[in-house]
Amino acid sequence: MSAIRYELIKTDKQTGARLGKIHTPHGTFDTPMFMPVGTLATVKTMSPEELKAMGAGIILSNTYHLWLRPGEELIREAGGLHKFMNWDQPILTDSGGFQVFSLSKMRDIKEEGVHFRNHLNGDKLFLSPEKAIQIQNALGSDIMMSFDECPPYPASHEYMKKSVERTSRWAERGLKAHERPEDQGLFGIVQGGAYEDLRAQSAKDLVSLDFPGYSIGGLSVGEPKDVMNRVLEHTTPLLPANKPRYLMGVGSPDSLIDGVIRGVDMFDCVLPTRIARNGTCMTSSGRLVIKNAKFTHDFRPIDENCDCYTCKNYSRAYIRHLIRCEETFGIRLTTYHNLHFLLNLMKQVRGAIMEDRLADFREEFFEQYGFNRPDAKNF
């Protein structure tokens, strides 16, 4: 029996978007869901209790980074990642593939795996499909990812075809290496760049392997948003309706809503936490850069329509002061707000699906947020 089970609750009559639940060994979470990213077994500046309070049903951790520090064996010794970081709800781990291809300037891709340099100290390392699974088995996450290649955008059709074929072979090898299928659900990752024929081939290959869930990778890597939406429209119908669909690395409010409309259930991104550290906040009326001088004497909350801890207790003027002085508490406050904003947005999206009005909600949100303006700024 699979460790992961998807339950469809309702389909939105306006868009076909899915409302559901995903059942895991560490509990159930509602979908669509945004997953905060805890790269090194922590969501930067946030406690597990705070994440639960804001409605995070699942968080993500990074296999590559935990492999390097503190090492998967230490985490196994601690009783697994859940005990190590004191998080008793579901955890998803990536395979490390994206970090290998994005952080290492020197890498050599072979059929057996990837030889590359440790981005911390320059040491030579090797990561294979089997090793990526072995590390994740030691971590004990509820949902694991297959090892895949993440080609940059744009890439030629010829290169992408070879990459997709290799990723499919790696997925099969990883599935065979998986030692804990009853405790951990392993997802296959659909690749293919912007090429619809290669996306179809990748999806066909992976569906034939009968994974308990499917990820859509290789998007949000520099391609225009209309390209991403086109690829999603083509790809999600090729994936089983009775299994979860996870769009990797996407976290801007507009892309979350558009992804849900195109059949996606799960999302993750460092965006809300990364921009928070620079003092950029997501609000119901658009992006707010708290460092701007116009907020020096502004004693309103970041977002007057927000009921998060930050907005109920602190002013723009105070948070601006903290961020400008590089005080950690300022980063905590903006991080809390941004994560709460996205998690609450997904709660609103789920409510709109339940009421069969997601297309209307999208129009209202885009109008209020400013995405419909010709000069709209992307995050």
Swiss-Prot record:
Catalytic activity: 7-aminomethyl-7-carbaguanine + guanosine(34) in tRNA = 7-aminomethyl-7-carbaguanosine(34) in tRNA + guanine
GO BP terms, alphabetized: queuosine biosynthetic process; tRNA wobble guanine modification; tRNA-guanine transglycosylation
Keyword tags: Glycosyltransferase, Metal-binding, Queuosine biosynthesis, Transferase, tRNA processing, Zinc
Co-factor binding comment: Binds 1 zinc ion per subunit.
Residues given in the record as Zn(2+) binding sites: 306, 308, 311, 337
Cofactor names: Zn(2+)
Protein origin, superkingdom: Bacteria
InterPro entries per UniProt: ArchSynthase1/Queuine_TRR, TGT, TGT-like_sf, tRNA_ribo_trans-like
GO molecular function, a single term: metal ion binding
Catalytic residues in the record: 94 (proton acceptor), 268 (nucleophile)
Pathway listed: tRNA modification; tRNA-queuosine biosynthesis
HAMAP family tied to this protein: Q_tRNA_Tgt
Classification via PANTHER family: QUEUINE TRNA-RIBOSYLTRANSFERASE
Family of the protein in this entry: Belongs to the queuine tRNA-ribosyltransferase family.
Protein's recorded name: Queuine tRNA-ribosyltransferase
Gene responsible for this protein: tgt
